[in-house]
């Protein structure tokens, strides 16, 4: 059983075994949803108990934007792929270009907020991840993009563990 606290106890005596599939985490603000995802992804450590974090291919996405300002969306995507040692196939590139409404050559600095968040989300299409943790990022993009992401995640649910936090009602279809 693990525990995690800050000024107050966020998670106490939790024990989880999570199978492959898609899971939605719900709760009030400050209830520990983000902390739980960070612990599971290995980005935070438990205060007490055994640490049973994942050690395979993990994608963790939150509301932080991942881009570098002077580059295009495509150049930023290449930087991310290089950091994860991902080689994109022609089909992957085409799917990602469609995800960006064929605007992958646009400058990251002038892109909309939703497009900037799509940069991290596009990694969902780049690889078959063992674990995907999505913390609120889905609420920042348009309905068409959510539909594309939902279809991709549903296609991965037999081989991946996908856990997401979202207040966007469009995402209820994932479960």
PLM regions with names:
Residues 41-82:
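ABC ATPase nucleotide-binding domain signature region
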Residues 94-112, 128:
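Conserved ABC nucleotide-binding domain
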Residues 136-137, 142:
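Walker B catalytic motif
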Residues 119-121:
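Hydrophobic anchor residue at the start of the ABC signature
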């Amino acid at each position: 059983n693990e525990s995690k606290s800050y000024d107050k106890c966020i998670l106490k005596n939790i024990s989880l075994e999570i199978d492959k599939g898609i899971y939605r985490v719900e709760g009030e603000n400050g209830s520990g949803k983000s902390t739980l995802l960070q612990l599971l992804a290995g980005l935070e450590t438990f205060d007490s108990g055994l640490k049973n974090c994942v050690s395979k291919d993990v994608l963790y996405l939150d509301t932080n934007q991942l881009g570098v300002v002077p580059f295009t969306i495509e150049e930023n995507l290449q930087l991310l792929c290089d950091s994860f040692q991902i080689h994109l196939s022609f089909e992957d590139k085409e799917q990602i270009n469609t995800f960006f409404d064929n605007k992958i050559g646009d400058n990251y600095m002038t892109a909309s907020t939703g497009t900037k968040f799509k940069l991290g989300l596009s990694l969902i299409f780049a690889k078959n991840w063992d674990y995907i943790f999505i913390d609120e990022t889905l609420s920042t993009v348009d309905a068409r993009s959510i539909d594309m992401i939902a279809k991709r995640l549903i296609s991965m649910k037999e081989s991946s563990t996908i856990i997401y936090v979202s207040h966007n009602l469009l995402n209820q279809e994932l479960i």
